Amino acid sequence: KVHPLGFYSCTLLHENNQKIRLHYWDSITNGEQQSSELMIHDHIFDFKSWIMLGALENTEYEVSDEGELYYLYSTKYENDSSILKITEDSLKITHKNSSIYTQGMSYVMGANVLHKTRSLTDRAFTILHTQDMEYTSPRVLSNTNTSESEIIFHRKDVNEHELLKKLTTLVF
C-alpha cells in the first residue's frame, strides 16, 4: 500500500501486537503523500528499523514552552483510509535531535515520540519491527492552521506490475 508519509508499505507478518513490515522509499511519489506540513507524527508502537538500502534522516521533537506552535490532529483508520481530524489542542515543540542512518544501520524509537523521517537517497529500503504499546490515537502535527477539519488519505494498493518494476531496480 502507499503510505500517507510517502513510502510503500507491505506487512509481512502480523501476530498479536507485533508486525514485520517492508518499507520502500522512492524519490517519485507522484503526489501520493499527505501535505509536507503534516509529516511530524508519533506512533502507538515501539519499533526497530533496519536500513537495507539507502539512507534516512530521522528528526525528533519535544514539547517545550519555548517551541513553535503546532496544531494537533488525531488519526483514525477506516478500511484503507487514514483520517486526520483537527482537535482543539495545540502543542509547542522544539527540535530535539536529527540522526542519519545508512545501509546496514538500525535504530529504535519508542511509542509517542514526535518525529519525522525522510529518505536522503532516491531509493531506500527498510525492514520495520513494531510492537503495539497502547491503542490511543496517533498524533499528527501541523504548523499551519488549515480550514479543513478532516483530511482523508486513501492507502491505495500498489499493483503487482508496478511493485515488481520498483523491486527489480533494487541492487543490494
Which residues does each predicted region cover?
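Long hydrophobic alpha-helical segments typical of transmembrane helices together
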Residues: L141-F172
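Short, conserved beta-strand element in jelly-roll/cupin
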Residues: D42-N58, E62, H129
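Hydrophobic/aromatic beta-strand patches that form the interior of the parallel beta-sheet core
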Residues: K48, Y107-V108, F125-I127
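Short beta-strand His + acidic residue motifs that chelate non-heme Fe in jelly-roll/DSBH
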Residues: N58-T59, H115-L120
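Short acidic-glycine-tyrosine-enriched beta hairpin
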Residues: E62-A111
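A short hydrophobic beta-strand segment most commonly corresponding to one strand
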Residues: D122-P138
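Conserved short histidine dyad/triad with adjacent acidic residue
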Residues: L22-D42, T59-D65, A111
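A short, N-terminal "cap"/entry segment at the start of jelly-roll beta-barrel domains
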Residues: K1-D26
